[in-house]
Amino acid sequence: MNFEVFALGTSGMMPLPNRFLTSAMVRRDGDLFLFDCGEGTQISLKMLNLKWKKINTIFISHMHADHVTGLPGILMLSSQVDRDDPLTIYGPPRLKEYIDANRRILDMYINYEIIVKVAHPGILIDNDEFTVSAFPLAHTKPCTGFVMEEKLRPGEFHPELASGLGIPMGPLWGKLQKGFSVTLDDGRVIQP
């Protein structure tokens, strides 16, 4: 399990020849999570050989054009690469209206389900391996920041070392493997 972060676009307000508008991608064990989707996002994805249909979730911070103008193209292209899985998009309250208007005006054919959710402050995704949380940011209009945080994973446990230290097999071994210190009957504190 590992996280890889790709800066797809680092320019603000207007794209530059070598810098597209705001977007970032996190790849985690083959799944892709897109944070903002400015103009040029498709080009960056193609240059980095990141697959559109692997995008599980998109997070949009706010409704300024430099953060959302790439979204219609990503949504249309995902249909052309035979996407089957639903796509969840978190963002501001008017994001669904923006997506629906683009679908209608551009006559977009979408062959998969798009689930649009308002990114209220707090935990948006919580599974066994990571969380994604939203929090308000100070900006010229309502804006949301996102944190993707990996949960603690059990470390490698060495039973022979535990036995050698006199730690009895059982619940104490489990606590050590999960990263917790344990206190033995003789008062010794064993660190993981």
Where are these regions (language model features)?
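Generic structural signal for residues in well-ordered beta-strands
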Residues: 5, 114-116, 132
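Active-site neighborhood of divalent metal-dependent phosphoester bond hydrolases
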Residues: 83-118
